[in-house]
C-alpha cells in the first residue's frame, strides 16, 4: 500500500516543491523563465559544462525519490545549437543502481552492467530545413540540437528498459539529474500510459481512447491553439517504441501513439538501408516511374497502385560547427557519455515557397528536377576523420617551467606545453601527447611506478586529470575546488594525490584526494582539505607514507598528515632561518635496512641560496649551507662554487639521488654536488635561470628546465649536454615556412626571432631585438633569407646563411602588421598600423623602395599575419582599408587600386556593421578573396567584381584570427580563440567542419605547409599537424606553382603567359553552382501552341506564330523548287497493284484496277493533285525551314582517334510527330532531337546516340517486341534522300536504310505480328509503302488521293490497317497471292454531323476491331470496321485531336489545346451491338491534365495507367493516371537557342531562346533546373556574373540577359527572381558580357551602339557609337595584361557585322575606356557574293597572349590570328566553309568552328590537324568551350549538344 499515494501519477516537481530548492538542488546557470509556447514557467538549464549546470532530484545522491511508477514522463526542450545530458538513476529489485542516460552528445548506444547510454535525436519544427534534411540521416547529422527544436514529451518505460537491456526487474526511481542545455517543464511518474495529444478536458467531449491509454493530466499537458494539431507543434517519443520498426539503440521520434486503423506504420530512418541515390520528390517519382516502366511485368491488370511512402525533397543545409565550449563539453563527455551521434526523425511534409511573378510578367519558375542524384541531403562527416593528427609541438612550459618528469625507465621525459602534455623520447626525439586540457597545465606528478600521471589545469575551469600513462587515456577528471593548482604530488602507491593552490579569496588551500578507485570506476574522492594563510611553494607526499606530506614556502617548512578525514600540519623550527623564502624540497633517496623508513634527511632549498638539511623523523634542523657566486678571475674561467656565509644565489629547484644532489639556480647554472656539498663536480650553464632539475631513475642523467624555455639533459658520465626543446617564452605573433627548405621562422612577443628545423624541431638560429618587438615575418621564396617587421616600423632583411643583416627599411612609423614577398621574390610588400603600405624591389645586392602609400590600410595593429594578402600568381594585393569596413584590392605590380568592397553592407539583415578583420586569397584561379569579419563570417569575394560568391557563417564564437586555403582550394582552415576548424569547400553546407583543440591561447596564425602535407598553427606554441587529406605531392609541384610575374621597374608590365589557362570567351566562364535551386511542383508556364493558320485566321496566332508563319511561307517557296519525280514513281509502282473503293454518303462508286492500268491511274492522280495545298492541321508534320545546307564533304576523324565524343543531348524535338518510343515491358525508351535518336536509360539517365540521319527526324515506330526501331528523316532541300533507318535496339546498329519517299515521312506502323511495316509520306510525297520486315523488301506502294495524317494496324487482324486524312478514313486490306501482294482500300467520308470541313487527324483501334478517329474539330468518331460505318461521335475536346490511344475500355485523347483526357468507353461496345437499346449511351471522362504544349506523341502501358507524352514545347512528360501526377522527363527549347554559357565548375550551363526563356541545366543529368520566362520578348544573349561558386550555401549568383526590346534583365539564380531591369538600348541587345572585375556590363545592340552599364546601380556609364549602323555580334573581355601595349587596363573587344573589330582598354575604377586598336577586314567586291548570314567572330587567343582570332565573311574562308603588339596577321587557317560560330579552348591549342553546312570542325593548331563531326540538322550557330577545356557545348537551332574533348 506504500505506493497507493502515487496513483494515478506523481508530479515530481510539485512533489519536491522544486521552487523552494529544499528537497532538490541546482548548480550553475539554472533559472526559471516564462515560455511563450507553453504559457507557463519552465526551468532553463544552460552552461558550457553539463556536469556544472544541472538540477538534481532529490538534493543529494544518498537520498532516493522512491517513485515506483513504471513510466517516466519528461517534458523538456533542448536548447538550439547545444548539447544536453539527462541521467536517470533507478534501482532494481536486487538492490543494484542503474544509471540510464540519454543525450544528443552520444555517438552510439553503450551498455555496461550499471550504465545505459542512449543517443537522443532532437526533433525540429515541421517543414524546417533541419526537419527536411534529417530524413534517414543516421551517420551524418551529428551535432547539437537544431535551431527549430521543439518541446518534447519523452515517455520512458523504465521497467521495460531494465528488462530488455539488463535482464533486471525494476523497483523504483532513485534520482534524476537534468544537465545543461535544455528547458524543462516537469517530470511525472505513473503506471498509466497517457496520450499527450488529449488532456482530461478534451477527453470529456471526445470519443473514448483505445484500451490502456489515458488522457494526459491537465497540469502536464501542452497547450494546442485552435486549428492546430498537437504533432505539428510538439514531439512525442515513447522509448522503447512499441513499433518493431523503430531502433532500440537510440531515442528518437516515431509515430503517433494513436494510429488510425489501417494506416501504414512509419518507417524508422535509422533502420532504413542506405540509399545509393538521395533525390527530391519529383525525381523520386521519376525513379518510381522508371522502376515501373523498365521492369518486365505480366499482363495488365486493373488493380490500383499503392504508394507506400512519399519521398522527401532534399534541401542542403550548412552544418553549425561546435564551438570552443561545446568542444570542452565533448572532451568531458568522451569519458562520461561517449561521443556525438544523432539520428534524424522523419516527417512527411515540406513547405514549398513559390515566387510570384512581378508586374512586368517575368515568370521565375523552378523545374521539378534536383541538381544531382548523388548528393545526400544529410549533413555528412568530413573524411578522413580526424583529418589532422598532431605530430610535433615546438614549445615548452606556458603556465610554468617548473615541471618536467622522468619516466620510470628513463627513456622519456614528460613536460607541459601550455594545454598539452608532451611525452618526448630522449633518443629519437619522437613525441606523443596527452590531449584533453583546455587551458594551461600548471602541475604534473607521477606515482612511484609511473603508471598514473596527474595533471592540473589552471584558469577559471581549474581541474585535475588522472591519466593512464601508457595508454594515454584519461581515467578521471574532477574539480579542484581551488582557482589554480600550483603544485601536485602523487603518493608512491598512486592512491593519494595532494594538490596546492589558491581559493577564490587568495588563501592557500591544500586538497588531498583518494585516487585508489580511479583506474576502475573513475571515481576520485576528497580525503581532506584545508585552508591556510601560509605560503606553499612545494608540497610532496612522502614516498614511504601516503598519509604524510611536507611543504615549504615563504617563511615556513611544514609537515602534514591526513588522519580521520582531517588534514593537520606542524611547522619545523628553523630558528634564525625562519624568514627565508623556501623554493623546493627533496627527500633523501634510497633506504637502508637498519633505519626506519621515516628516518631520513629532508633537503630544502631557498631563494637566498641556502640548503637546509632537516632530520625528518625528529623534526630537527641538522645543517645549513649556502651557495654563492665565485669570483671572476678570468673572463673565460670561473672558480669552483663553495658554501659560505657570503651572499647567495637563488636556488629554484633541487633534486637528490643516492649519490649526488642537483641544483638549479637563478644564475642559469645546473650544478651537481656530492651529498656532503663539498664542492661542485659538474655544472652546465644555461641561457636563463634554471627553474627545474630532475635526476633520472638510474642516476646518470639530469633533466633541466629554464625559465627561458629550454629543456635539456646533462649526461653525467660523458659530461655531454643535449638540448631537447627550446621555446618562445611569450605569445607567438607570426611564422613563415620556407618553400623549399624544411625551415620555419617564428617571431614572438619575447622579442626574439627564431628559425627551426621542422624535421628535428631543433632551433637553428636566434635573433634578439632588445627594445622592439618583431611583429611580422616572411621567408624569401627563393633565397635563404627572410624579412621581419618590428613594432618600431622598421623592416629588416636577414641573410640566413651569412647570419647577417642585409638591408633595413624605415618607411613606416607604426608597427608592421603585414609583410609579404611576391612569388618570385622580386617584390616585397609591407603595411603598418598607421595605415601606410609600401612596395619594394628586392634584388640580390640592392633593395629599393618603389612606392609608398599613406592612409590606405586600416589603422589597427591587431591584424597580424592577415593584414596583407597576395594572390598566388602575384598579381593582386589585398588588405583591409582604408576603414575597417572596406577591403581594397590593388594591382600588386604598381599598387594601383583595382577594387574596393564595403563588407558592412553585404549582410542586409544584420543590425550591426560588419568589420573586416583579415583576409587571404585562395591559391587557384579565380583567386577568391576570403575575408573574415567581426560577425564571425568568412566572405568569399570575387577579386575582380567584388561580388559575394559564398558566405560561411558562425565560423567561430569569437572572431576568426587566421584563415588559410589548401592549394587545391578544397579545404579551408580557420582559427578562432583556441580552436582550429577544417572546412570542406567542395561541398559547402553539406559537410560538417572538424574542430581541433589543444591551444590554450588564441591561435595567431594557421597555414598549410608548402608541400601541403602538414598544417602549422601558432599561438602559445607551434603545433605541426599531419594533414591526412593531403593531396598528391605531384599536384603541388605542377598545378599549383603560380606563374611568376616579371620584375617590376618603372611601370608594371604584364606577363602575357601567366594566364594561359584562361578561357578566351568570358561568357563561358560563369559561376559554378554548389547546389541547384530547389525545384517546385509546378512546371514553367508556357504559351498556347496553336496550329499555323492561314492568313484569314489572324486571331489564332500566338506570340510565336509569327515565326511559324514565316517558316510556312518559306516552305511554300521551297515547294516550287522540288523537281517532278513522277516518272520514277511510275516505275517503282509497277511492281504492285491497288484497288481503291470510295464511299460517299449518298452513293458508292467502285473502282477496280489491274496491274497493267494501275500506273496510268496513279499518273492521273499525280497530275490532278500536283502541288497539293499544305494541310491545315498541326498533326501533319511540317519540317522546319532551314537556310543551311549539307556539306559536300568532310574530314572524318580516324577511328579511335576522335577528339570529340558526344556525351549528352539536351532537348526533345517537339516539331516531330510520334517521335518518341517506349516499351513498358522491356523499358526501352527513345526519342529524337534534330537528326539524332537519343536512347536513354531511365534508371541511370545515361544516353546513347544513334547518328546517321542527315535531316530532321519526323517520326519513329517500334516493333511490338521492342527489338527493332524504325526512324524516318526527310530530304530537306532535295540534296539528300528521304531515309527510313531500321535499328537494332539491342546494340544500336543500323540494319537497313530504306529509300522510297521523296520528301518527308508522316507516319509509320508495324503490324501486330511485326511481319509488315507501312510508311506514309507527307502531303508533298503522297505515297504509301508496304514493306516486309523480312529483309525489308518493298511489297506494295500506293499513291494517295489526299494527305494522310495517321496510319495504324488493326491488332485483331494482321492484314488490316487504317489511315486518316482530310474528310475521310481509309480501311486497307492486304491480300497476298504467292509472291504478289495487293492492297484494297475502302474510303469512307466523315459523317455529316462532324462537318464536311473536318479532317480526321488521329486514329486508334481497340481489341475488338473498333476504330476511334479524332477530328480537327475536337470530336471523336467510332467506326465499325466490319460495316465501315460510323455509329457514334462525341465532342472530346475544343481543339484538334492529334493523339488517340485505346486500351480495353479506356481511351486517351490529346489535342492542341494542351490537354490530355482519359475516357471510359465501356458503353461503346454495347452501342455497337444494341444501338439505341443499349443500357448506357454515354462515355465518361475520368481524368484530365493540361500540359505545356500541343500533344504530338504518346505511349502508354496496356492499362492506360501510366505513360509518356511529348508536346510541341519540347517536353516529355511522365503521366500517372492512378496518382493523377505529371512529371517532366525531358525538357528542351521550343525555339532557337540564341546563346549559351557554361558555369564555372562545369556542373551547369545556361541557355536562352527566342521564346524569351532563360534556362539553367545540369550538365550531369541534362535536366532543367530553373527557368526564367519573359513574355512577348526574345532573349538574345546572356552572361554569368563572374563570381564562381563551389558549393551549396546561401550566397547568390546572377545571370544577365539581353532582350529584343533593348532591355537587360539581371536574374538572381538562388532567389529565382529578377533583381534588376535596365534599358540602355533603343533596339535589341545582341551581345552581352561582364567585365572581368564584374563592375560593369558591356552590351551591344542591333544598331551597333555599345553601352557600359553598372549592374549594381543600373545606370548607363557611357555609350560607344564606333560600330553604329552594324549589329554587334561579339563582346569579349580578358583580364590579361599584355607587355608591349601602351596601357595597363582591362582589355575587351567588340565585333560587328560589317567585319570590324575594335579593341579597348578600360580601367573601370578610374572611369577610363580607350580605343586601343581597330581592325577592318575586306569583303568580296561583288555585292552578289555578300552573305549576310555569316557573322563576324572574334576572340582573344588563350595560348597566344596579345593575339586576336578573327573569322568572318571575306574573300577567303579562313581564320586569322592577328597580333595586337606586332600589328600584323601571324597565322591563317583555311576553312572549307564560312564559320558561323567560333570558340577557343583555354586548356589546349584547339579551335572549334561551326558552319552553316551543319558541320562542327575541331582544329588542333599545334598539330595542324582537323576533324569534322556531323550530328546536326541545321547550321551550328553556337560553340562554347567550358572554362577547363574539358567540354564543348554547341547549339543548332533548338538542340544543345554536349561533347567531351578527348586529351584536352
From Swiss-Prot:
It holds the Pfam family WDR90_beta-prop_4th. Keywords: Cilium biogenesis/degradation, Cytoplasm, Cytoskeleton, Microtubule, Repeat, WD repeat. It is found in: Cytoplasm, Cytoskeleton, Microtubule organizing center, Centrosome, Centriole; Cytoplasm, Cytoskeleton, Microtubule organizing center, Centrosome, Centriolar satellite. Residues 257-278, 316-336, 1053-1133, 1151-1178 are annotated as: Disordered. One of its GO terms (molecular function) is microtubule binding. It comes from the Eukaryota. Residues 1102-1113 have a biased composition (Acidic residues). WD repeats lie at residues 436-479, 481-523, 530-570, 644-683, 685-724, 727-766, 769-808, 811-850, 955-993, 998-1035, 1252-1297, 1300-1341, 1343-1382, 1395-1433, 1435-1473, 1532-1571, 1574-1621, 1624-1663, 1670-1714, 1774-1813, 1815-1848. InterPro entries: Beta-prop_EML_1st (IPR055439), Beta-prop_WDR90_POC16_2nd (IPR055441), CFA20_dom (IPR007714), Quinoprotein_ADH-like_sf (IPR011047), WD40/YVTN_repeat-like_dom_sf (IPR015943), WD40_repeat_dom_sf (IPR036322), WD40_rpt (IPR001680), WD_repeat_EMAP (IPR050630). Residues 320-335, 1114-1129, 1164-1178 have a biased composition (Basic and acidic residues). One of its GO terms (cellular component) is centriole. Gene3D superfamilies: YVTN repeat-like/Quinoprotein amine dehydrogenase. One of its GO terms (biological process) is cilium assembly. Microtubule-binding protein that plays a crucial role in ensuring inner core protein localization within the centriole core, as well as in maintaining the microtubule wall integrity and the overall centriole roundness and stability. Required for efficient primary cilium formation. Belongs to the WD repeat WDR90/POC16 family. This is WD repeat-containing protein 90.
Amino acid at each position: 500500500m506504500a505506493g497507493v499515494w502515487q496513483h494515478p501519477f506523481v508530479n515530481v516537481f510539485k512533489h519536491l516543491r522544486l521552487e523552494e530548492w529544499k528537497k532538490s538542488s541546482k548548480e550553475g546557470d539554472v533559472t526559471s523563465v516564462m515560455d511563450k509556447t507553453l504559457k507557463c514557467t519552465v526551468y532553463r538549464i544552460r552552461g558550457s559544462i553539463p556536469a556544472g549546470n544541472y538540477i538534481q532530484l532529490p538534493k543529494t545522491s544518498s537520498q532516493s525519490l522512491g517513485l515506483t511508477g513504471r513510466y517516466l514522463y519528461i517534458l523538456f526542450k533542448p536548447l538550439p545549437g547545444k548539447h544536453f545530458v539527462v541521467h536517470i538513476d533507478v534501482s532494481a529489485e536486487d538492490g543494484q543502481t542503474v544509471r540510464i542516460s540519454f543525450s544528443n552528445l552520444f555517438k552510439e548506444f553503450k551498455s555496461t552492467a550499471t550504465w545505459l547510454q542512449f543517443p537522443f535525436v532532437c526533433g525540429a519544427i515541421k517543414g524546417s530545413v533541419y526537419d527536411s534534411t534529417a530524413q534517414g540521416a543516421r551517420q551524418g547529422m551529428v551535432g547539437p540540437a537544431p535551431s527549430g527544436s521543439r518541446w518534447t514529451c519523452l515517455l520512458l518505460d523504465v521497467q521495460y528498459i531494465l528488462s530488455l537491456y539488463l535482464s533486471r526487474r525494476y523497483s523504483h526511481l532513485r534520482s534524476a539529474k537534468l544537465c545543461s542545455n535544455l528547458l524543462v517543464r516537469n517530470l511525472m511518474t505513473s503506471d498509466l500510459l497517457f496520450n499527450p495529444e488529449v488532456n482530461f478536458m478534451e477527453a470529456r467531449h471526445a470519443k473514448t481512447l483505445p484500451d490502456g491509454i489515458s488522457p494526459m493530466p491537465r497540469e502536464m499537458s501542452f497547450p494546442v491553439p485552435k486549428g492546430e494539431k498537437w504533432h505539428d507543434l510538439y514531439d512525442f517519443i515513447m522509448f522503447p517504441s512499441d513499433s518493431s520498426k523503430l531502433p532500440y539503440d537510440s531515442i528518437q521520434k516515431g509515430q503517433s501513439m494513436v494510429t488510425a486503423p489501417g494506416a501504414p506504420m512509419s518507417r524508422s530512418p535509422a533502420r532504413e538501408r542506405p540509399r545509393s541515390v538521395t533525390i527530391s520528390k519529383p525525381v523520386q517519382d521519376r525513379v518510381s516511374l522508371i522502376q515501373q516502366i523498365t521492369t518486365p511485368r505480366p499482363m495488365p491488370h486493373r488493380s490500383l497502385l499503392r504508394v507506400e511512402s512519399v519521398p522527401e525533397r532534399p534541401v542542403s543545409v550548412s552544418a553549425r560547427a561546435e564551438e570552443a565550449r561545446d568542444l570542452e563539453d565533448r572532451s568531458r563527455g568522451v569519458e562520461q557519455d561517449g561521443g556525438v551521434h544523432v539520428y534524424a526523425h522523419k516527417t512527411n511534409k515540406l513547405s514549398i515557397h513559390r515566387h510570384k511573378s512581378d508586374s512586368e510578367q517575368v515568370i521565375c519558375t523552378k523545374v521539378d528536377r534536383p541538381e544531382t542524384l548523388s548528393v545526400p541531403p544529410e549533413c555528412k562527416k568530413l573524411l578522413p576523420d580526424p583529418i589532422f593528427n598532431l605530430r610535433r609541438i615546438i614549445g615548452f612550459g606556458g603556465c610554468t617551467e617548473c615541471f618536467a618528469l622522468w619516466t620510470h625507465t628513463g627513456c622519456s621525459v614528460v613536460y607541459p606545453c601550455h594545454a598539452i602534455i608532451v611525452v618526448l623520447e630522449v633518443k629519437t626525439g619522437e613525441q606523443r601527447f596527452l590531449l584533453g586540457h583546455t587551458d594551461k597545465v600548471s602541475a604534473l606528478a607521477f606515482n612511484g611506478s609511473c603508471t598514473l600521471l596527474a595533471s592540473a589545469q589552471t584558469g577559471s575551469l581549474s581541474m585535475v586529470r588522472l591519466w593512464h600513462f601508457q595508454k594515454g587515456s584519461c581515467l578521471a577528471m574532477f574539480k579542484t575546488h581551488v582557482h589554480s593548482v600550483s603544485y601536485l604530488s602523487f603518493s608512491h602507491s598512486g592512491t593519494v594525490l595532494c594538490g596546492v593552490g589558491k581559493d577564490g579569496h587568495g588563501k592557500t588551500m591544500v586538497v588531498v584526494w583518494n585516487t585508489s578507485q580511479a583506474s576502475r570506476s573513475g571515481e576520485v574522492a576528497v580525503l581532506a582539505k584545508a585552508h591556510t594563510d601560509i605560503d606553499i611553494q612545494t608540497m610532496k607526499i612522502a614516498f614511504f607514507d601516503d598519509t604524510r606530506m611536507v611543504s615549504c614556502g615563504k617563511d615556513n617548512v611544514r609537515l602534514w598528515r591526513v588522519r580521520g578525514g582531517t588534514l593537520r600540519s606542524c611547522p619545523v623550527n628553523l630558528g634564525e632561518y625562519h624568514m627565508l623564502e623556501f623554493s623546493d624540497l627533496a627527500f633523501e633517496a634510497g633506504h637502508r635496512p637498519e633505519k626506519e623508513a621515516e628516518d631520513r634527511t629532508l633537503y630544502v632549498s631557498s631563494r637566498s641560496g641556502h640548503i637546509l638539511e632537516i632530520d625528518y623523523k625528529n623534526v630537527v634542523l641538522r645543517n645549513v649551507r649556502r651557495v654563492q657566486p665565485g669570483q671572476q678571475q678570468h673572463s673565460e674561467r670561473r672558480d669552483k662554487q663553495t658554501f659560505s656565509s657570503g651572499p647567495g644565489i637563488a636556488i629554484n629547484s633541487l633534486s637528490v639521488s643516492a649519490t649526488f644532489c642537483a641544483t638549479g639556480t637563478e644564475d642559469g647554472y645546473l650544478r651537481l654536488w656530492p651529498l656532503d656539498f663539498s664542492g661542485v663536480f659538474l655544472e652546465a650553464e644555461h641561457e636563463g635561470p634554471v627553474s627545474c632539475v630532475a635526476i633520472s631513475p638510474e642516476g646518470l642523467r639530469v633533466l633541466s628546465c629554464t625559465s627561458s624555455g629550454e629543456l635539456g639533459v646533462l649526461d653525467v658520465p660523458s659530461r655531454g649536454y643535449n638540448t631537447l626543446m627550446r621555446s618562445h617564452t611569450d605569445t607567438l605573433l607570426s611564422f613563415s615556412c620556407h618553400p623549399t627548405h624544411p625551415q620555419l621562422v617564428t617571431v614572438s612577443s619575447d622579442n626574439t626571432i627564431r628559425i627551426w628545423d621542422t624535421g628535428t624541431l631543433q632551433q637553428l638560429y636566434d635573433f634578439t631585438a632588445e627594445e622592439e618587438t618583431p611583429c611580422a615575418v616572411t621567408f624569401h621564396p627563393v633565397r635563404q633569407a627572410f624579412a621581419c617587421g618590428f613594432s618600431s616600423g622598421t623592416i629588416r632583411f636577414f641573410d640566413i646563411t651569412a647570419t647577417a643583416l642585409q638591408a633595413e627599411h624605415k618607411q613606416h612609423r607604426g608597427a608592421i602588421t603585414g609583410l609579404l614577398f611576391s612569388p618570385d621574390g622580386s617584390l616585397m610588400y609591407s603595411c603598418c598600423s598607421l595605415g601606410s603600405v609600401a612596395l619594394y624591389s628586392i634584388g640580390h645586392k640592392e633593395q629599393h623602395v618603389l612606392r609608398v602609400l599613406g592612409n590606405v590600410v586600416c589603422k589597427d595593429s591587431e591584424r597580424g599575419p592577415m593584414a596583407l594578402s597576395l594572390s598566388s600568381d602575384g598579381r593582386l594585393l589585398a588588405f583591409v582599408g582604408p576603414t575597417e569596413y572596406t577591403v581594397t584590392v590593388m594591382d600588386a605590380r604598381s599598387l594601383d587600386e583595382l577594387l574596393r568592397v564595403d563588407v558592412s553592407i553585404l549582410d542586409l539583415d544584420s543590425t550591426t556593421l560588419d568589420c573586416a578583420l583579415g583576409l587571404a586569397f585562395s591559391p587557384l584561379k579565380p583567386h577568391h578573396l576570403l575575408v573574415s569579419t567581426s560577425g564571425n563570417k568568412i566572405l568569399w569575394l570575387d577579386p575582380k567584381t567584388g561580388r559575394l560568391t559564398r558566405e560561411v557563417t558562425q565560423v567561430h564564437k569569437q572572431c576568426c584570427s587566421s584563415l588559410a586555403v589548401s592549394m587545391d582550394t578544397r579545404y579551408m582552415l580557420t582559427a578562432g580563440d583556441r580552436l582550429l576548424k577544417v572546412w570542406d569547400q567542395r561541398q559547402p553546407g553539406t559537410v560538417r567542419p572538424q574542430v581541433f583543440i589543444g591551444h590554450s591561447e588564441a591561435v595567431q596564425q594557421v597555414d598549410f605547409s608548402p608541400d601541403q602535407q602538414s598544417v602549422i598553427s601558432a599561438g602559445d606554441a607551434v603545433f605541426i599537424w599531419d594533414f591526412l587529406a593531403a593531396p598528391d605531392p605531384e599536384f603541388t609541384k605542377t598545378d599549383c606553382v603560380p606563374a611568376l610575374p616579371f620584375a617590376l621597374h618603372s611601370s608594371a608590365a604584364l606577363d602575357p603567359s601567366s594566364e594561359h589557362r584562361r578561357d578566351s570567351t568570358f561568357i563561358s566562364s560563369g559561376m559554378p553552382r554548389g547546389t541547384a535551386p530547389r525545384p517546385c511542383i509546378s512546371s514553367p508556364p508556357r504559351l498556347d501552341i496553336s496550329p499555323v493558320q492561314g492568313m484569314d485566321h489572324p486571331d489564332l496566332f500566338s506570340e510565336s506564330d509569327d515565326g511559324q508563319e514565316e517558316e510556312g511561307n518559306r516552305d511554300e517557296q521551297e515547294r516550287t523548287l522540288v523537281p517532278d519525280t513522277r516518272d520514277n514513281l511510275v516505275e517503282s509502282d509497277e511492281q504492285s497493284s491497288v484497288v481503291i473503293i470510295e464511299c460517299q454518303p449518298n452513293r458508292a462508286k467502285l473502282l477496280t484496277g489491274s496491274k497493267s492500268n494501275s500506273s496510268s491511274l496513279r499518273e492521273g492522280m499525280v497530275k490532278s493533285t500536283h502541288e497539293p495545298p499544305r494541310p491545315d492541321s498541326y498533326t501533319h508534320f511540317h519540317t522546319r525551314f532551314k537556310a543551311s545546307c549539307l556539306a559536300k564533304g568532310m574530314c572524318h576523324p580516324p577511328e579511335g582517334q576522335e577528339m570529340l565524343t558526344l556525351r549528352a543531348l539536351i532537348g526533345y524535338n517537339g516539331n516531330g510527330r510520334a517521335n518518341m518510343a517506349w516499351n513498358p515491358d522491356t523499358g526501352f525508351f527513345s526519342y529524337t532531337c534534330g537528326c539524332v535518336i537519343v536512347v536513354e536509360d531511365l534508371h541511370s539517365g545515361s544516353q546513347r546516340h544513334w547518328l546517321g540521319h542527315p535531316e530532321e527526324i519526323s517520326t519513329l515506330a517500334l516493333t511490338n517486341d521492342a527489338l527493332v526501331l524504325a526512324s524516318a528523316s526527310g530530304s530537306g532541300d532535295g540534296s539528300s534522300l528521304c531515309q527510313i533507318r531500321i535499328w537494332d535496339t539491342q546494340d544500336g546498329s543500323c540494319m537497313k536504310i530504306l529509300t522510297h519517299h521523296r520528301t518527308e515521312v508522316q507516319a509509320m506502323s508495324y503490324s501486330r505480328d511485326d511481319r509488315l511495316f507501312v510508311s506514309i509520306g507527307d502531303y508533298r510525297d503522297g505515297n504509301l509503302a508496304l514493306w516486309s520486315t523480312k529483309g525489308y523488301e518493298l511489297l506494295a506502294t500506293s499513291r494517295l488521293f489526299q494527305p494522310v495524317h495517321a496510319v495504324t494496324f488493326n491488332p485483331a487482324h494482321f492484314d488490316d490497317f487504317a489511315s486518316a486524312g482530310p474528310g475521310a478514313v481509309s480501311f486497307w486490306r492486304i491480300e497476298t497471292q504467292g509472291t504478289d501482294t495487293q492492297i484494297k482500300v475502302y474510303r469512307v467520308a466523315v459523317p455529316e454531323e462532324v462537318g464536311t470541313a473536318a479532317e480526321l487527324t488521329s486514329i486508334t483501334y481497340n481489341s475488338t476491331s473498333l476504330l476511334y478517329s479524332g477530328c480537327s474539330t475536337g470530336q471523336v468518331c467510332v467506326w465499325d470496321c466490319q460495316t465501315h460505318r460510323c455509329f457514334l461521335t462525341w465532342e472530346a475536346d475544343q481543339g484538334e485531336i492529334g493523339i488517340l490511344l485505346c486500351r480495353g475500355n479506356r481511351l486517351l485523347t490529346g489535342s492542341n489545346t494542351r490537354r490530355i483526357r482519359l475516357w471510359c468507353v465501356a458503353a461503346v461496345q454495347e452501342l455497337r451491338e444494341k444501338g439505341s437499346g443499349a443500357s448506357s449511351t454515354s462515355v465518361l471522362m475520368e481524368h484530365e491534365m493540361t500540359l505545356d504544349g500541343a500533344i504530338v506523341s504518346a505511349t502508354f502501358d496496356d492499362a492506360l495507367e501510366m505513360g509518356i507524352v511529348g508536346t510541341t514545347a519540347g517536353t516529355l512528360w511522365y503521366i500517372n493516371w492512378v496518382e493523377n501526377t505529371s512529371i517532366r522527363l525531358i525538357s528542351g527549347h521550343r525555339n532557337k537557342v540564341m546563346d549559351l554559357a557554361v558555369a564555372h565548375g562545369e556542373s551547369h550551363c545556361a541557355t536562352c531562346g527566342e521564346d524569351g526563356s532563360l534556362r539553367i541545366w545540369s550538365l550531369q543529368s541534362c535536366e532543367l533546373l530553373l527557368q526564367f520566362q519573359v513574355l512577348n520578348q526574345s532573349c538574345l544573349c546572356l552572361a554569368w556574373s563572374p563570381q564562381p561558386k563551389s558549393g551549396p550555401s546561401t550566397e547568390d549568383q546572377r545571370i544577365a540577359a539581353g532582350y529584343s526590346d533593348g532591355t537587360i534583365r539581371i536574374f538572381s539564380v538562388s532567389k529565382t527572381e529578377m533583381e534588376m531591369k535596365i534599358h540602355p538600348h533603343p533596339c535589341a541587345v545582341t551581345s552581352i558580357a561582364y567585365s572581368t572585375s564584374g563592375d560593369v556590363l558591356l552590351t551591344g545592340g542591333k544598331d551597333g551602339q555599345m553601352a557600359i552599364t553598372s549592374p549594381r546601380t543600373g545606370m548607363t556609364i557611357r555609350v560607344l557609337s564606333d560600330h553604329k549602323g552594324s549589329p554587334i555580334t561579339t563582346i569579349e573581355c580578358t583580364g590579361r595584361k599584355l607587355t608591349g601595349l601602351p596601357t595597363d587596363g582591362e582589355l575587351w573587344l567588340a565585333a560587328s557585322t560589317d567585319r570590324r573589330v575594335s579593341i579597348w582598354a578600360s580601367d573601370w575604377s578610374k572611369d577610363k575606356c580607350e580605343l586601343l586598336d581597330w581592325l577592318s577586314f575586306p569583303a568580296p567586291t561583288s555585292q552578289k557574293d555578300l552573305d549576310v548570314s555569316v557573322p563576324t567572330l572574334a576572340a582573344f587567343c588563350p595560348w597566344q597572349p596579345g593575339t586576336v582570332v578573327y573569322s568572318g565573311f571575306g574573300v577567303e574562308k579562313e581564320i586569322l590570328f592577328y597580333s595586337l603588339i606586332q600589328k600584323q596577321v601571324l597565322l591563317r587557317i583555311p576553312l572549307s566553309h564560312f564559320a558561323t560560330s567560333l570558340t577557343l579552348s583555354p586548356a589546349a591549342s584547339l579551335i572549334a568552328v561551326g558552319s552553316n553546312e551543319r558541320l562542327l570542325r575541331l582544329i588542333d593548331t599545334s598539330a595542324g590537324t582537323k576533324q569534322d563531326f556531323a550530328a546536326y540538322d541545321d547550321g551550328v550557330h553556337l560553340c562554347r568551350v567550358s572554362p577547363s577545356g574539358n567540354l564543348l557545348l554547341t547549339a543548332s537551332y533548338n538542340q544543345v549538344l554536349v561533347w567531351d574533348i578527348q586529351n584536352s
